């Protein structure tokens, strides 16, 4: 069979078929990758500079994100910080409160504009996911948070009796909904964050017995999966004032996965952004720690990490200078714990494999 070497003829045929596809399916249905308007993935700050580094810049826009972990580990806090960041940049944010547990006072303390926040408290999982799909398709909303997947109860389960068995109903619901939602997300550029809970698998003798609710569909469709854990309780004397948390990027389709970030969450205030700055300034050598003392340019600024954070709070101009120096070092390729890839465990590697979602 002769190979067609007529380049101009091929180009003419290609132009004709591209025009025909665009007439049939709309402009933008097919394009050269170099012509795409969104070659670089835009990001939303998570509120923690260390987590932004671990994510390769922040939470990606126009993607499905899953945040999961044990109770009171900071899942909703990270999601609320993302909402606040979008609102600060003039975007519209929505919160689907399936758990009926949103605290407006805490959200406001984290910087969320609660007066302009769209909130829905649906009764069934079908209603919640249909609302999410309509918000995404509108292309008017920039970010939607669903709290949580475990609370998306199928209508049949709500209307049935207490002891009825409903095997796989929620997994099928999530699979059907995500097939619709992901296609619309790509067109609208809306970020959808699912908060999820952990459950224990019964009879597991090898590997981690932990699993997330809602089946495998969300694992498959999510571009980013964040595993957040509380690793330390922060105390002043006997009074607890916050938690130290560790976030593992269990899956990332837009940057290297398996990075780990640590930061503080202060009760009533949210993520300690200046705590992240102090940690990164120390790792990059901008602030030097000798024993308990922290120094900058040879001058002692505080004794102890908490006092170093307090010093930056009291001197915002100095804090901005340190932030700028940290970012410059990181832009030049400085390697810190948050942007170095941690060794993946066997459980991580199993999690990264994309399984076909169950029907």
UniProtKB/Swiss-Prot annotation:
It is found in: Cytoplasm. SMART domains: AAA (SM00382). InterPro entries: AAA+_ATPase (IPR003593), DNA_recomb/repair_RecA (IPR013765), DNA_recomb/repair_RecA_CS (IPR020584), P-loop_NTPase (IPR027417), RecA-like_C (IPR049261), RecA-like_N (IPR049428), RecA_ATP-bd (IPR020588), RecA_C_sf (IPR023400). One of its GO terms (molecular function) is single-stranded DNA binding. Residues 337-359 are annotated as: Disordered. This is Protein RecA. GO terms for cellular component: cytosol. PANTHER family: MITOCHONDRIAL DNA REPAIR PROTEIN RECA HOMOLOG-RELATED, RECA. PROSITE patterns: RECA_1 (PS00321), RECA_2 (PS50162), RECA_3 (PS50163). Belongs to the RecA family. One of its GO terms (biological process) is DNA repair. It holds the Pfam family RecA_C. It comes from Nostoc punctiforme (strain ATCC 29133 / PCC 73102). It comes from the Bacteria. NCBIfam families: tigrfam_recA. Residues 346-359 have a biased composition (Acidic residues). Can catalyze the hydrolysis of ATP in the presence of single-stranded DNA, the ATP-dependent uptake of single-stranded DNA by duplex DNA, and the ATP-dependent hybridization of homologous single-stranded DNAs. It interacts with LexA causing its activation and leading to its autocatalytic cleavage. Keywords: ATP-binding, Cytoplasm, DNA damage, DNA recombination, DNA repair, DNA-binding, Nucleotide-binding, SOS response. HAMAP family: RecA.
């Amino acid at each position: 069979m002769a190979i067609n070497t007529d380049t101009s003829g091929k180009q003419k045929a290609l132009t004709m078929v591209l025009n025909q596809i665009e007439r049939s399916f709309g402009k933008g249905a097919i394009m050269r990758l170099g012509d795409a308007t969104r070659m670089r993935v835009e990001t939303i700050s998570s509120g923690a500079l260390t987590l932004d580094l671990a994510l390769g810049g922040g939470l990606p826009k126009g993607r499905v994100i899953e945040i999961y972990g044990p109770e009171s580990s900071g899942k909703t806090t990270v999601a609320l910080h993302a909402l606040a960041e979008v609102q600060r940049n003039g975007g519209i944010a929505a919160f689907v409160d399936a758990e009926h547990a949103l605290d407006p006072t805490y959200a406001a303390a984290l910087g969320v504009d609660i007066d302009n926040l769209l909130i829905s408290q649906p009764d069934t999982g079908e209603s919640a996911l249909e609302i999410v799909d309509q918000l995404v398709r509108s292309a008017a909303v920039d970010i939607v948070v669903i709290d949580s997947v475990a609370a998306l109860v199928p209508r049949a389960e709500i209307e049935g009796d207490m002891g009825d068995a409903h095997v796989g109903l929620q997994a099928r619901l999530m699979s059907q909904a995500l097939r619709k939602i992901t296609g619309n997300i790509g067109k609208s550029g809306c970020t959808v964050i699912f908060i999820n809970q952990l459950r224990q698998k019964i009879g597991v003798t090898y590997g981690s017995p932990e699993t997330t609710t809602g089946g495998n569909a969300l694992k498959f469709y999510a571009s980013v999966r964040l595993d957040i854990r509380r690793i330390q309780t922060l105390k002043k004397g006997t009074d607890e004032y916050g938690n130290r948390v560790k976030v593992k990027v269990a899956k990332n389709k837009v940057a290297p996965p398996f990075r780990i970030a640590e930061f503080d969450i202060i009760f009533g205030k949210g993520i300690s952004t200046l705590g992240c700055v102090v940690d990164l300034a120390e790792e990059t050598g901008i602030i030097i720690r000798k024993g308990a003392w922290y120094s900058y340019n040879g001058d002692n600024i505080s004794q102890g990490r908490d006092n170093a954070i307090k010093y930056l709070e009291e001197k915002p101009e100095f804090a901005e200078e340190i932030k700028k120096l940290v970012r410059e070092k990181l832009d030049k390729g400085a390697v810190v714990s948050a942007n170095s890839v941690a060794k993946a465990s066997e459980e991580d590697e199993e999690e990264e494999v994309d399984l076909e979602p169950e029907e």
